[in-house]
Amino acid sequence: MKKIMVVDNEPDIVDLTRTVLELGGYQVVTAFSGEECLRKLEKERVDLVLLDIMMPGMSGWDVFNRINKKSPDVKVAFMSVLEISEKRKQVLLDEGLADYIMKPFDKDTLLDRVDRILAEKTEKAEA
């Protein structure tokens, strides 16, 4: 079973996202800050991190950069209310970001995007 970490400082968002992912057949780990995410990644192996950008303390940008350098095999997707330009999004994708998911999202969209990210990861691992 694929394991996903959901990182957001809003407990309601974490709970909703966890519920949707668990109903989709995924194992879910949660964190409420960038620092907590990085601590948990030291101990737990995950396939994907769904990461909010705007959090107190360490931002999602900083967390993404640290994960990308230390564990490039772990996929990261941003979940955010922040709209970014297509140019900026492409730069992030070129730097290794797996996806940029706008909040609010519906459950089908979230599961479709997560399924696609993890399918691409599996295909690359098998190649």
What do the PLM-derived regions correspond to, one by one?
Residues P11-V29, E95:
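Two-component/phosphorelay signaling modules centered on CheY-like receiver
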Residues F32-S33, S59-D62:
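Acidic catalytic/metal-coordinating carboxylates
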Residues R39, W61-P72:
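Short amphipathic alpha-helix used as the core "switch/output" element in two-component signaling
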Residues R45-L50:
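Active-site beta3 strand of CheY-like receiver
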Residues D52, S80:
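Active-site residues of response regulator receiver
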Residues M55:
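Receiver (REC) domain active-site loop signature in two-component systems and cognate sites
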Residues D62, L82-D99, D112:
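Alpha4 helix (beta4-alpha4-beta5 surface) of REC/receiver domains from two-component response regulators
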Residues F105-V114:
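C-terminal output helix
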